[in-house]
């Protein structure tokens, strides 16, 4: 298992592109003299100040909220499959993360279930040897059967999704990798992940995201319980960050109904996007 791979129950996951890591992260720009409207203090305890690099647009990547393709999956035990789907689908993250229409916020949603085709896997994914590459062949002791026609269709979707994601990005984009995880995996409410490479946001941006969630009363993990963020190669640099929501902060995991905090969380995320975009107009 590579150092980024995480085991979620019976599913081996590293949906964030380990292969994209390279030596030599971007140098952090010098601080500006402008101070944020609120007294946000970072991990070092100092007052957070403006950095030079901000964003012209935000791209929301929502890869694991879909359920399409489940009906065509051939496997040893369909009941066991549906148990895994229930647990590991990022239920309703599209409804939580996507704000009201904003021309500077784009989104892409995989409508296929990750159990049909996982659009965040790598073409030469190390998990392929465990039967959990782009097309999962093994999970929870079950064997899946895929004929060549079905494989061709699923791989075509994989390529199309990744091409569309890349087309949304520019050198001044912030890519937000949007996920959720079962509540029994961690006591963290929200996990913030990033790569230690060219795609890593400045410490200021990371601190801003973390501190805003903390101000709303959430317990925040940094690259824990999960780490990294998707960062497909495009030929230019941009920033990428992962936001993983503990399902308990927005969902009743038994009934699959939104809880009372769900609309608040959606507003809090929208406010975060606005803050990240607003400052790009001022620097």
Residue ranges and their predicted role:
Residues 2-5:
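Cysteine-centered motifs
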Residues 15-17:
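Short hydrophobic alpha-helical segments enriched in small aliphatic residues
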Residues 20, 32-33, 44:
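Serine residues within intrinsically disordered or low-complexity segments
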Residues 22-23, 27:
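Polybasic, lysine-rich low-complexity intrinsically disordered segments
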Residues 43-175, 180-283:
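N-terminal catalytic or cofactor-binding beta/alpha core of small enzyme domains
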